[in-house]
């Protein structure tokens, strides 16, 4: 992260376990902090690869690093084991009831400093935050270095297609589909 020294350092530290899992050097694809405010909505079941990431390369690993404790009550991550081997269900669409018929979403509560690593084909979701306190999670996503460095292009594309509220054209509808 060019904007925050601590996140830049963490992003570098996370490269080691991600590289070990990938079996080669990695580069950061994207990073974010998810803030889930009290009453804040969850995320419908999806695979990260459904959001058009295949335009850049075919495989990513994401590291979730817990900042604030996550619980079932404040909308912790829920993942499905084993279905990442099914590959991409459908690009630009969330998972359907038919896709999820034999999936069991498992809650993954975390404490500050805990890390969860999952790939771009792992079905996952979260529920709304029913607590009276905001909770935060840091996500860093990496791809193989041999597949290229796409970080700048990803953020340029995201800004162009889904700009922050302050930069949106009046009257234009922006829909993030996954």
Region annotations inferred by a language model:
Residues 1-32, 55-56:
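Signature of the catalytic double-stranded beta-helix
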Residues 29-37, 77-80:
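Short, surface-exposed recognition loops or helix-turn segments adjacent to catalytic cores
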Residues 31-33, 63-65, 138-142:
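A structural signal for short, well-ordered beta-strand segments
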Residues 35-51, 70-72, 120-121, 125:
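Conserved short histidine dyad/triad with adjacent acidic residue
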Residues 37, 67-69, 142-144:
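Non-catalytic surface loops within mature trypsin-like serine protease
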Residues 47-64:
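Acidic, His- and aromatic-enriched active-site or binding-groove loops in soluble protein domains
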Residues 70-125, 147, 160-166:
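Double-stranded beta-helix
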Residues 122-123, 127-178:
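Non-heme Fe(II)/2-oxoglutarate
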């Amino acid at each position: 992260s060019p904007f925050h020294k601590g996140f830049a350092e963490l992003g570098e530290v996370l490269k080691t376990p991600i590289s070990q899992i990938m079996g080669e050097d990695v580069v950061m694809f994207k990073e974010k902090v998810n803030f889930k405010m009290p009453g804040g909505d969850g995320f419908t079941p999806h695979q990260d690869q459904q959001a058009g990431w295949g335009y850049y390369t075919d495989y990513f690993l994401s590291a979730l690093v817990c900042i604030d404790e996550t619980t079932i009550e404040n909308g912790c991550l829920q993942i499905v084991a084993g279905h990442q081997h099914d590959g991409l269900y459908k690009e630009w669409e969330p998972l359907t009831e038919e896709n999820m018929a034999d999936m069991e979403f498992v809650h993954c509560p975390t404490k500050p400093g805990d890390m969860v690593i999952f790939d771009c084909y792992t079905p996952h979701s979260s529920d709304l935050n029913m607590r009276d306190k905001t909770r935060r999670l840091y996500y860093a996503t990496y791809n193989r270095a041999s597949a290229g460095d796409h970080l700048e292009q990803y953020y340029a594309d995201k800004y162009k297609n889904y700009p922050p509220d302050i930069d949106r054209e009046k009257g234009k509808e922006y829909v993030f589909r996954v």
